Amino acid sequence: KTENICMKKALDWSRLVNQSMAMVSDTKKPPFEGTEDALRLAREYADIVILTAANRQEINKEWEVFELAQYTDLLMSQETGRKEECLKTLLEKGYERDHVLMVGDAPGDLAAAQGTGVLFYPILAYQERESWEKFSKALECFTEGRYAGVYQEERIKEFQENLHIEGK
């Protein structure tokens, strides 16, 4: 609870976004082509955690409708905390930093990965299908311990160029 008018407006806006997402038909927001194949493959080698800033109820519904939930072990959503906090929680449970690969499509995803020292694989805007198709190569590098370093740096550079953002 807060008396801060800005915080109240932000909370109201967040609730409206969640309500509007619930009104969009699930058939109108299918996963990108290649997503299921990538999850199925990754599931053979790793625990899969959905880490999203979205509403837990909506994500659960979407992932069930498209039968993606079967490939996941845990859902961490806006109700769980910010992405960086969620990654820290996973690390506290015993995951090693170089054994965590965050897959994301937003600058905040990269920032959360970098802020916690975990690895990052980008899904490029307007190249989502291609990004998911290339994921098998990234997963191979990841499972063989070759992801960190040059391979990851190249992926991050592609991501930053795709979004026209400056690298740090």
Predicted feature residues:
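Short, mixed-charge, low-aromatic patches
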Residues: D12-S20, L39-I48
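A metal-dependent, Asp-based hydrolase signature
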Residues: K1-S25
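C-terminal cap/substrate-recognition subdomain and adjoining C-terminal extension
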Residues: T27-D47, N55-K168
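Conserved phosphate-coupling serine/threonine residues in phosphotransfer and NTP-handling enzymes
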Residues: T52
